[in-house]
């Protein structure tokens, strides 16, 4: 199982979103996603998060929260465990991203963007105001979402 991170960076009621329009043969082509990527050898999720955000945006995170785990199962690729974060503190200025166009989008409008169907599921969990950690499994067949597990919530002390 591969490990990835995804972060929704917040500022003034908006999330920083990445419109994937620059890479060829990109499974995310044309979609809007948060910032993140694959963990490198021996990286913790937090190390991966900070590195990926810096590489893709130029920003250095100063305040972030681990919000949930998403297990992706697909008949076309290796299973993925995605660590979902939100961040509300950062330093630096946005840079040009070689994977797509970065844009600040009103949080309420994000689920209406062209995203993966499963992304809308966990985006709605984040936007619900519920603060507890979540875990959910999303199963895809090709590009179609065929199963969504009931999200579990955990209080972390």
Which role does the model predict for each range below?
Residues 126-145:
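Short, active-site-adjacent segments that bind or coordinate small-molecule cofactors and metal centers
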Residues 72-93, 120, 124-126, 130:
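Active-site-adjacent beta-strand/loop module that shapes the phosphate/pyrophosphate-binding cleft
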Residues 16-51, 149:
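Conserved Nudix-box catalytic region and its N-terminal flanking loop in Nudix hydrolases
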Residues 60-68:
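A short coil-to-beta-strand element that immediately follows conserved catalytic motifs
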